[in-house]
Amino acid sequence: HTLSDANPLTNQWAAEEFFRSVSGALGDADNVIYEICNEPNGSTSWADIKAYAEAVIPIIRANDPDAVIVVGTPTWSQDLAAAAADPLPDANVMYALHFYAATHEDDLRHALSTAVAGGLPVFVTEFGICEASGAGEIDYASANLWVRLMNELDVSYICWNLSNKDETAALFKPGCAKTSGFTLDDLTDEGLW
């Protein structure tokens, strides 16, 4: 699934082939988390995503029965309420939330709190401390509120993005070409945070 597809059902056959291959190759590894349906958008509904997940998850489970599988949620992985209202029956599934601290504030934090309080297992598989575009200003106050909340709720999170792209969300400065031996001078403001 790519963002330009908007709906994961568009190329579901390709996702099935991909996850069959990847889970076949990595099924014995105990450190692999599968994220299916990255940032569904446009008019994609939870029913669309759920149908996709119900087709793809058994393919992964055939090769990796105990793996954690994270499923994207509608509206760029932000509509946890839709997933909470009709969750998948699989016991080892989590639901993705993506946010950018300078864009997504109290409303989305409340949605996360509500979903977790209701028992929905959530993994923040992408966040940044800048605007949702990956550019713009950093909002340290909102970012700190987000991290405090995720820690209080025991929600795992991953910061986007580990690159040297010329944008606010990148953790490394554009001129950094290293693959190891990083110093603080190699980091952007988001990387230093």
Where are these regions (language model features)?
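Extracellular glycoside hydrolase catalytic/binding regions
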Residues: 11-33, 37-165, 169-193
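Aromatic-lined carbohydrate-binding surfaces of glycoside hydrolases
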Residues: 1-8
